[in-house]
UniProtKB/Swiss-Prot annotation:
Cited SUPFAM superfamilies: dsRNA-binding domain-like, RNase III domain-like
Entry note: thermal dependence: Optimum temperature is 40-70 degrees Celsius.
Protein name as it appears in the record: Ribonuclease 3
Cellular component terms (Gene Ontology): cytosol
pH-activity relationship: Optimum pH is 8.0.
Leading EC class: hydrolase
Gene: rnc
Domain annotation DRBM: ranges: 168-237
Origin organism lineage: Bacteria, Thermotogati, Thermotogota, Thermotogae, Thermotogales
Record carries keyword Transmembrane helix: no
Length: 240
């Protein structure tokens, strides 16, 4: 870690209250592959992406969610538990948890990802959260993960069990827009951009011809979903 990287790692610990014995683990958890690739190409060999931690974190998360379900819902059918487990460990939920702790603010991203909104992209936030879980597990053990996140995941799991959890932002946005404007929202592909050789789709969601949000993604579908999420959250905020 260089000094500027160490400063961000220390700021993360101060802001979240999650303190690491081995700060290198935390640094690695916050390093997106785009940043690691840039640094490696610049001659640094000490920067590793969070992909391996994400791999471990996926397994830690599954155990964590399964344990909550096993203890809290002893009468539930296995099929129902599997459905809820899948929803509770979904990209959408992990991105929600990440936003709540402001995880995106501390991520190390390559220039291309930074420019195309990667800091607030569901997939990047979810992957980083899994990497963070693995880093905490390796640094402080499984009980620390339960101490930090059990209450929050119990909240989401309960809402999923009750059928109250909303993941389909496009459907949710359509319901609001049609009730208020009597027309469905439109999704318009406005351009594509290049990011480290990959295509990034840029989609606007419009109501009566007026753009209310813009989303970016590696596929048109992902960009539409991101635009719908931003528009939905914007409309909810305006209503409150």
């Amino acid at each position: 870690m260089n000094e500027s990287e160490r400063k961000i790692v220390e700021e993360f610990q101060k802001e979240t209250g999650i303190n690491f014995k081995n700060e290198e683990l935390l640094f690695r958890a916050l390093c997106h592959s785009s940043y690691a690739n840039e640094q490696n190409q610049a001659g640094r060999k000490d920067v590793e992406s969070n992909e391996k931690l994400e791999f471990l974190g996926d397994a830690v998360l599954e155990l964590f969610v399964c344990e909550i379900l096993y203890k809290k819902y002893p009468e539930a059918e296995v099929g129902d538990l599997a459905r809820v487990k899948s929803a509770a460990a979904s990209e959408e939920v992990l991105a929600m948890v990440s936003r709540k702790m402001n995880l995106g603010k501390f991520l190390f991203l390559g220039k291309g990802e930074e420019k195309t909104g990667g800091r607030d992209r569901d997939s990047i936030l979810a992957d980083a959260f899994e990497a963070l879980l693995a880093a905490i597990y390796l640094d402080q053990g499984y009980e620390k993960i339960k101490e930090l996140f059990e209450q929050e995941f119990e909240f989401y799991i309960e809402k999923i069990m009750k059928g109250e959890m909303l993941f389909d932002y496009k459907t949710a946005l359509q319901e609001i827009v049609q009730s208020e404007h009597k027309v469905p929202p439109e999704y318009i592909l406005v351009r594509t951009e290049k990011n480290d050789g990959d295509r990034i789709f840029v989609v606007e969601v419009r109501v009566n011809g007026k753009t209310i949000a813009t989303g970016k993604g590696r596929t048109k579908k992902e960009a539409e979903k991101e635009a719908a999420r931003i528009a939905y959250e914007k409309l909810l905020k305006e209503r409150s």
